[in-house]
Amino acid sequence: MTITNDIRYIGVNDHDIDLFEGQYIVPEGMAYNSYVIIDEKIAVMDTVSADFGEEWLANLENVLAGRKPDYLIIHHMEPDHSANIDKFVNAYPEATIVGNAKTFEMIDQFFGRGLCKNKLAVKNGDTLSLGRHELTFLFAPMVHWPEVMMSYDETDKALFSADAFGKFGALDCQDKEWDCEARRYYMGIVGKYGMQVQAVLKKAAALDIKMICPLHGPVLTGDLSHYMSLYDIWSSYGVESEGVCIAYTSVYGNTKKAAELLAKKLEERGCKAAISDLARCDMAEAVEDAFRYGKLVLATTTYNADIFPFMRQFIDHLTERNYQNRTLGFIENGTWAPAAAKIMKAMFEKSKNINYIDTTVTLRSAMTDENAEAIERMAEELCR
């Protein structure tokens, strides 16, 4: 695939994968992106996941047209991008591996010492001339590993962004809008590191970027302000859309009835409601919704003097990603000693700028008329 006159795509699509990073459902597969800049000197940008080494090397050989690469630039050492460094070195032993000090530490950890006979350790802001193209290296630590760096090509105004601006899905399954699966990817993979992403966005703002070449998902061109704006909202923990995320667990269906009634009452008032059964839905989508919308209602049962396990897991996903700047409400259920609301609220005690609505709904086993009235009040409060 030709990206520009000099930049070629040599990545692969993975349709066999069911769980990315062992946890994220990817029904449309995954793309592992790799690029080549053809110039007086040739630079290969990253490798691909382990199972696709031969396909990747064949793609590379096809675009080289008899030439040999001069550099392999490693932006990110996670194995879905670095697993074939050894195959590359064996195929092209004269090529130079380009990374930073942390990159080479990780290469030694993954492959053992001595793999890279020819290597170039770069620092933040260093440049590398390929001829017409000059690359500037921009370090992006903890977006989302400590060694991550990006490259900016001044000639084609291309930012090679590592995992930033990536999304789930193979490239031959990209009919859907970018936002949804990019959001789920960001919240799951990068969401904890908002401060670090903000630092990268400031660096990017000083560059004249015409295209973004991520390690997952499509190359981004055209009006890049849309993608930059979303990344700014996500990484500053801002509210992307007005609405209420309702996440619930239910043992015998009674808490579910309360959650569904709340969703109905919200929609009757013209408020967007996104509802998730945490035991059955893709939890990553529920996490995505919790960060997308400005308000969150958690509904669960008291369980073993604690809360239902899926709800505890969900809240952990939120708090470990620095959940903040939101309005929260609670629906609890308990037959003899309801304590879920108190427990859930305590789990957010270290979260910043969390506001709690006045209404908490407490079910004692099953829904009552009084509970329905309380849910009406909750819906009214959430829609103000």
Where are these regions (language model features)?
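Active-site neighborhood of phospho(di)ester-bond hydrolases with catalytic His/Asp-centered motifs
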Residues: 45-47, 69-77, 97-100, 159-163, ...
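Metal-dependent phosphodiesterase/nuclease catalytic metal-binding core
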Residues: 36, 150-213, 221-248
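Short acidic active-site motifs
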Residues: 84, 282-286
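FMN-binding flavodoxin-like domain, especially the glycine-rich phosphate-binding loop
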Residues: 171-212, 216-219, 261-276, 286-384
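Short, charged N-terminal beta->alpha structural module
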Residues: 247-269
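Active-site metal-binding motif and surrounding structural segment of the metallo-beta-lactamase
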Residues: 40, 51-98
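Metallo-beta-lactamase
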Residues: 2-5, 99-148, 193-199
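Conserved beta-strand hairpin/beta-sheet module of binuclear metal-dependent hydrolase folds
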Residues: 2-61, 150-153, 157-161, 255
